[in-house]
Amino acid sequence: MVRLLGIDLPRNKRIAYALTYIHGIGLTSAQKFIELAEISADTRTDDITTEQAVVLRNLLENCELNLEGDLRRFNGLNIKRLNEINCHRGKRHRNSLPVRGQRTRTNARSRRGAKKTVTGKKK
């Protein structure tokens, strides 16, 4: 099992797709890291040698990207700042509503949560 930046990568996936389990790395940047580490794109996570894992770990730790914990902290602080200055986006985050102008009369279920049923009024 390969462990990078505190994340256990899935065992039987191709290494490019396994790297996307690290917060902040998408498929494109994963492919660039693999190319820099001189690892074949068809290599599975189980087939990575310890030397290749060390090279990959060094590349990820020394890159200029914010990854994993730093990125989560950065995003959390940005949302906290929006809440503190009481702007529209901060209010939307606080109320668990869509932030980027999407409609809420219908849809937005994943952001707002499951429907809350209201009992009908008896006559």
Curated annotation (Swiss-Prot):
Region feature (Disordered): 90-123
PROSITE patterns noted in UniProt: RIBOSOMAL_S13_1, RIBOSOMAL_S13_2
A GO CC term attached to the entry: mitochondrion
Annotated keywords: Chloroplast, Plastid, Ribonucleoprotein, Ribosomal protein, RNA-binding, rRNA-binding
Entries under SUPFAM superfamilies matching the protein: S13-like H2TH domain
Coiled-coil portions: none
HAMAP family: Ribosomal_uS13
The protein, known as: Small ribosomal subunit protein uS13c
The organism of origin for this protein: Thalassiosira pseudonana (Marine diatom)
